[in-house]
């Protein structure tokens, strides 16, 4: 009899626990939007760590002649942030001009810091002010014939900036400097 009661109590506890877990795992559209904002804020802080770690006199460093310098990588990241988020949200982005990464005057540490932080500020505000009910709509990219949802474009933007920030890890290491500690949260 004691075994039956114990089994019953355990079974009831399992049902109660499962029910509570199901309730706790429900995400609203606003939860998803808030998480996306949090991700952009984290990415901004992490990228600023990278910008601060590389010495100002090494922003022009290229591991090889055929690839972008550290400054060019970061300026490319900034321009792509604006491109993806303006396409995903239809919110007008600041104009950095085309090919900012090729402009020598933009490649100083102060200029790169300005453009990169401005791009992240735009991304954070674009997500905050976007209409999440439209995130499922398809958008045609102006190249390659690609068509993606607005939400997919937001995810591609996160992936793209992480990719280019990650590429600069080796630039920092080749200067004999330890790169910033990863910021997962």
Identify the residue ranges that each predicted region occupies:
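Short, contiguous alpha-helical
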Residues: 37-41, 48, 58-101, 139-185
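Acidic/histidine-rich alpha-helical segments that form the ligand environment
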Residues: 104-141, 148-160
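Bacterial Sec-dependent N-terminal signal peptides
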Residues: 1-27
């Amino acid at each position: 009899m004691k075994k039956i009661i114990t089994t019953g109590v355990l079974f009831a506890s399992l049902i109660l626990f499962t029910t509570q877990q199901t309730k706790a795992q429900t995400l609203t559209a606003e939860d998803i939007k808030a998480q996306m904002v949090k991700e952009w804020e984290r990415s901004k802080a992490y990228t600023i760590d990278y910008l601060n770690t590389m010495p100002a006199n090494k922003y022009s460093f290229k591991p090889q002649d055929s690839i972008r310098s550290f400054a060019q990588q970061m300026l490319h990241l900034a321009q792509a942030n604006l491109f993806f988020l303006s396409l995903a949200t239809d919110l007008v982005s600041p104009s950095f001009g085309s090919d900012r990464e090729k402009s020598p005057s933009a490649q100083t540490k102060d200029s790169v810091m300005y453009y990169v932080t401005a791009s992240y500020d735009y991304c954070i505000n674009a997500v905050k002010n976007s209409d999440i009910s439209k995130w499922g709509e398809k958008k045609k990219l102006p190249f390659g014939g690609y068509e993606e949802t607005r939400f997919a474009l937001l995810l591609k933007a996160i992936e793209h900036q992480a990719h280019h920030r990650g590429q600069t890890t080796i630039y920092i290491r080749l200067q004999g400097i330890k790169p910033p500690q990863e910021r997962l949260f």
